[in-house]
Structure formats: structure tokens, C-alpha cells
């Protein structure tokens, strides 16, 4: 056990985490040169393209150090994005050490800090590494200063390397072996193994990635999953080198995979503890397990109504590999049949949409994302509302609570003003502001409903892409939010309802109505577009009727003749308006999303 090192790599997007992992795998001979490809550990295409890691992956490597001993290194690759922060904390709790990779030309970024604090809270030894020192713009000294200022760990002896060229990578491994402690644990104690991640394989069912904390796990053992209470028979255990290599057993301190004939992911929850059924069951599960709750909801509808079943199948297949995705059927008068889906955050939502479109060839319409509001009713009950259409009648509502998130923003000094203005527009309240060299850290509390619409895009545009952010849920607070309904000729259109703060409601109502006016085609009669809160109309636009010139045949002549013709036309229009219904084009729903992006 003294020769095992479990570690993960913490880095911001594009700071070279996956490349460094590739180099380490190559150096330790985990894959032959023929099998080596860029970003070995990112298995989904979308991970490679966006350069992000979504699912955790591992590699068990052996490395002969300069002191002549052979060490077993277990690299656990973690997602870097805030939406997947629970997966990150589980991956980190399976390690004793973490390499903090910082781009020497860019310095510290927000997500690095968020994940680094998670690591420090979990008692993981953080080893700073400066990457990309081969770049002409690299400034290692100021990067070291930033690590010390922002994160507060000693970085004077940070290892310098370039993952692209391979310079300094052996030094990184030596530093890792020297600084990271060996795992503690008793191979003879009752079994406790932490599920770091799980995914679905078409041939063997669910594959669980585990870190054995105490005890030994062998094939043919009967095991119990403590959170669900389900029992399974282990079929196979082994390690990834990144290829899967079966082993006879996994003992304390090791990281590997377990296949136990589980059919669905819901049964193997990330963060759960595996123990033996007989003869010795562990007394308590490992700490830190929690159910992941979706934070952002949106409706997904197929463009073609006959694609509904196909969309259901696609979502079910995605759910096999992504237990945090939730969905339930939903019917909208305007868009037909679809699903209300729950996501961990905005990035998660984009990834799910992109995977549906790319891997399953679906054409989708997405409604505006919303968050979960808690509505206290007059009769003392509380309801959770994640869909504007389900908001109770205003007369029954006592108060509405909205989720507030704490947002940490990092940006160069020159963009502070623009970012503060943006946060104020989004009803944020400033908590803290501190300077670290050229970088500024701002902490705000902002309602989550304001974040999910377009905060991230706007932040990137006001700071020319230099600002980075991460957010975490803080609490629910009472807020004066209202539901704005859109009426067309007096009929409510459910899919266009939005929940906004009262102070912003008139502006948003006007914007949406104006946008709809451009999009709805002219009819033979006037079409009234109204935005209303309850029965109170706050904005109105008219789409003018198309009319035929009925006076064209009267050359001169008597006024009463003209009046008669005009009256007759008016009568006809009135009758039409009673029976006619306005078709709302699909673009209108997308327009609502566009309004929010302005």
C-alpha cells in the first residue's frame, strides 16, 4: 500500500488537463504508442470537441521512480465544470492528492479555485503545477504569485512543465510521489468501497468505478449498495489502464471497476458505498453521499409530432449514462407533446441538447429555461413550481421564494465596471471584492432565475471572454416575482409564459409583445397581442389586418354609398374574427429565448 498514489488533476477549461493526462499515461506505458491518441480519457466526441471532461475516467499506471521503487499511480480524471461539482467532490474524495494545473500564461481561473477549495475541504494534498511554459506569453512567476494570493497554498516550488512537448512531466510525477501521502485503509477490515462514477455498457450492464477504502473486493462476492439497499453478485473486477484489465481482487487503497449485473444507473448512485452482504457488513456508509437534484428545467419538444416516442427513447438512453438527467411527459397547447427535463445547470442542459441532436438525430424546440420556485399558499401548503404554466392562481399565493446562488467572478481589472453593471442589472448584491495582482475577484449573490437565462453569455461579451465564473446554490429567499402570460386575441398561450421579477415585468412584457408582433403573420382581421399579470394587462401590440380596397369601384359618387361598402367590410371582418384562430409560428417560441438574450 505504501507504493500506491491516488490522484486527480484540477484545471480550468483549456489549461491542459487532458494533455497532461495523455503524457503521464504515455510516460508510464499505459498504452502503446500505436493506441495513443489525443485526450485519451475523454470518451465522448462532445468532450473532445468542447475540450471539457464530463464523466470521470481512470487509469491505473505503474511508474518506476528515481529512487528505484515502482509506484502504482491511479489517475482519476475529474470533470472541471461547476455543473458537475458533485461528481468532482466524489472523485476528489477518492484521492489523497490533486495536481493543480495552472496555465502559466493565463493564471488562476474561477473553476480552478472552486474545485481547489473542494479539494482542500476534503483534506486532499494539492500539488501545484505550471503548464504551457513553452509558450512565449508564459509568465510563471506571476502565476505562482496568483496561486498563493487567490488559493492560499505555498507554490514557490511548483513544478514547471509543458504537457504538449513533454518537458518536465517526469518532474511532475516525482513531485507527486514525494508530496502525496499513500492511502490509509485496512485490507482485512469489512469492505467499504466508494462509487466514484458509473456508466452503462451495452454488453455487461452498469460498470461502477470504485475506490476501495477498507477491505477487499473479489469477483463472485455478494455485495450490498448502502443507499438503495439492493444486493448484487459481483461478476468481474479490474482496473483501467485506460483499457480495461480484469483482476482477481481490488483491495484497500486501489481504484478499479466493478461489474455486478446491474441493469440501470439509478441503482448505482455516485457517492454510494458498496459493502459485503455476508459475512461482514460495514457498520456505516462512507460520508458525503447526497442525491443530486436538478436546478434548471426546460421543456423539450420534437419539431415533428410523430417524433415523440423517438424522443422518449433517446432521453431514456441518455439517462442510462447520466443519472442526473430527469424528465417527465408534458403537454403544451401550443407545442403538443414533449418532456419537461431537469438539468444540473446550463452547461449540462446544452450538452444534453447537443447529444440528442447529434447522437439521436432529433430536431428539438426548447422552451426558456426556468428554475424551481417555492410557492407558499394561503392555505399553508408549499408547492414546488418548475414550470410557469403550473404557477397557482395569484389570489391563492401568500409568498414566492426564489433560489439565490453565490457567484464567484474572476476578471482582469479593466472589466470590473462592466461586470458590476451586469450583476446589478441581474438584481445581484455584492458580498465581496478583492484584488490579486492584475486579477479581481468579485462575489455576488444573484437570483438563479437571472443566471440561467443569459448571464454567462453576457458576462463573456462584456469582458471580451476574460471573465470566468462559478456558482453554487445558497438558499431560498422571498421575492416579488410574477408570472407574465401572453394572450393572443384573448387566448392564453401556455408555452410563452415567463416568471420574472415585478420590477422587470413591464419591460419584459413589452419586449416579448413587440417581438411577437414582428413574427405573427398578418391575418384578415386585427390580432391583439397582450402581456398580462393575472387579469392586469401590462403591454399590448396590434398586428394590423390585411384589407381589400372596397372603394376602388366607386368613381366619385355619393358618400353614403362608400359608407355602406365600408360598413359591410367591417361586418365581415368582425364575423371572421369570431371564428378565426391565429396560427403561431414555431419561430415565436424561439423569439422568446432571443428576447432574453438581448
Curated annotation (Swiss-Prot):
Bilayer topology term: Peripheral membrane protein
Cellular component annotations (GO), alphabetically ordered: plasma membrane
Pfam families cross-referenced by the UniProt entry: EFG_C (PF00679), GTP_EFTU (PF00009), GTP_EFTU_D2 (PF03144), LepA_C (PF06421)
PROSITE patterns documented for this protein: G_TR_1, G_TR_2
Record has GTP-binding as a keyword: yes
Alphabetic keyword roster: Cell inner membrane, Cell membrane, GTP-binding, Hydrolase, Membrane, Nucleotide-binding, Protein biosynthesis
Function of the protein: Required for accurate and efficient protein synthesis under certain stress conditions. May act as a fidelity factor of the translation reaction, by catalyzing a one-codon backward translocation of tRNAs on improperly translocated ribosomes. Back-translocation proceeds from a post-translocation (POST) complex to a pre-translocation (PRE) complex, thus giving elongation factor G a second chance to translocate the tRNAs correctly. Binds to ribosomes in a GTP-dependent manner.
UniProt-recorded name of the protein: Elongation factor 4
Amino acid at each position: 500500500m505504501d507504493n500506491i498514489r491516488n490522484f486527480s488533476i484540477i484545471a480550468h477549461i483549456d489549461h491542459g488537463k487532458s494533455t497532461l493526462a495523455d503524457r503521464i499515461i504515455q510516460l508510464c506505458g499505459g498504452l502503446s504508442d500505436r493506441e495513443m491518441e489525443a485526450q485519451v480519457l475523454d470518451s465522448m466526441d462532445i468532450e473532445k470537441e468542447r475540450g471539457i471532461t464530463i464523466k470521470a475516467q481512470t487509469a491505473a499506471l505503474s511508474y518506476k521512480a528515481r529512487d528505484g521503487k515502482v509506484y502504482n499511480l491511479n489517475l482519476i480524471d475529474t470533470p472541471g465544470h461547476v455543473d458537475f461539482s458533485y461528481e468532482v467532490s466524489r472523485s476528489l474524495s477518492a484521492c489523497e492528492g490533486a495536481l493543480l494545473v495552472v496555465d502559466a500564461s493565463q493564471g488562476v481561473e474561477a473553476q480552478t479555485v472552486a474545485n481547489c477549495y473542494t479539494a482542500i475541504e476534503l483534506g486532499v494534498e494539492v500539488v501545484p503545477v505550471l503548464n504551457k511554459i513553452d509558450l512565449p506569453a508564459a509568465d510563471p512567476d506571476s502565476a505562482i504569485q496568483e496561486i498563493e494570493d487567490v488559493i492560499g497554498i505555498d507554490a514557490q516550488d511548483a513544478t514547471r512543465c509543458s504537457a504538449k512537448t513533454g518537458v518536465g512531466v517526469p518532474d511532475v510525477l516525482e513531485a507527486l510521489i514525494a508530496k502525496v501521502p499513500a492511502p490509509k485503509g485496512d485490507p482485512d477490515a469489512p469492505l467499504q468501497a466508494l462509487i466514484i462514477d458509473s456508466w452503462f455498457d451495452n454488453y455487461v450492464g452498469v460498470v461502477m468505478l470504485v475506490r476501495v477504502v477498507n477491505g477487499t473486493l473479489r469477483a463472485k462476492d455478494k455485495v450490498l449498495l448502502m443507499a438503495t439497499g439492493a444486493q448484487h453478485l459481483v461478476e468481474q473486477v479490474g482496473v483501467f489502464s485506460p483499457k480495461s484489465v480484469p483482476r482477481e481482487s481490488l483491495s484497500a487503497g486501489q481504484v478499479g471497476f466493478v461489474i455486478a449485473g446491474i441493469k440501470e444507473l439509478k441503482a448505482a448512485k455516485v457517492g454510494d458505498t458498496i459493502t459485503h452482504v455476508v459475512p461482514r457488513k460495514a457498520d456505516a456508509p462512507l460520508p458525503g453521499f447526497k442525491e443530486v437534484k436538478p436546478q434548471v428545467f426546460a421543456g423539450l419538444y420534437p419539431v415533428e409530432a410523430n417524433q415523440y416516442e423517438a424522443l422518449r427513447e433517446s432521453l431514456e438512453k441518455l439517462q442510462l449514462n447520466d443519472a442526473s438527467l430527469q424528465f417527465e411527459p408534458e403537454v403544451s397547447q401550443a407545442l403538443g407533446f414533449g418532456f419537461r427535463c431537469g438539468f444540473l445547470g446550463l452547461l449540462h442542459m446544452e450538452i444534453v441538447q447537443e447529444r440528442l441532436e447529434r447522437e439521436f438525430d432529433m430536431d428539438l424546440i426548447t422552451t426558456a429555461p426556468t428554475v424551481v420556485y417555492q410557492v407558499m399558499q394561503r392555505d399553508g401548503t408549499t408547492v414546488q413550481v418548475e414550470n410557469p404554466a403550473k404557477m397557482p392562481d395569484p389570489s391563492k399565493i401568500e409568498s414566492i421564494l426564489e433560489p439565490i446562488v453565490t457567484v464567484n467572478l474572476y476578471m482582469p481589472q479593466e472589466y470590473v465596471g462592466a461586470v458590476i453593471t451586469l450583476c446589478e442589472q441581474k438584481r445581484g448584491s455584492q458580498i465581496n471584492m478583492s484584488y490579486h495582482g492584475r486579477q479581481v475577484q468579485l462575489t455576488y449573490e444573484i437570483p438563479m432565475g437571472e443566471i440561467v437565462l443569459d448571464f454567462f453569455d453576457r458576462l463573456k461579451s462584456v469582458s471580451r471572454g476574460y471573465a470566468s465564473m462559478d456558482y453554487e446554490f445558497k438558499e431560498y429567499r422571498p421575492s416579488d416575482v410574477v408570472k407574465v402570460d401572453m394572450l393572443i386575441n384573448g387566448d392564453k398561450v401556455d408555452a410563452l409564459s415567463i416568471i420574472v421579477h415585478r420590477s422587470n415585468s413591464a419591460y419584459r412584457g413589452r419586449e416579448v409583445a413587440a417581438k411577437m408582433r414582428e413574427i405573427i403573420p398578418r391575418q384578415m382581421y386585427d390580432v391583439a397581442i397582450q402581456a398580462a399579470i393575472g387579469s392586469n394587462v401590462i403591454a399590448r401590440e396590434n398586428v394590423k389586418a390585411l384589407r381589400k380596397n372596397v372603394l376602388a369601384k366607386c368613381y366619385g359618387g355619393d358618400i353614403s354609398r362608400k359608407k355602406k361598402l365600408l360598413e359591410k367590410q367591417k361586418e365581415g371582418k368582425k364575423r371572421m374574427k369570431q371564428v378565426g384562430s391565429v396560427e403561431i409560428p414555431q419561430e415565436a417560441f424561439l423569439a422568446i429565448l432571443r428576447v432574453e438574450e438581448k
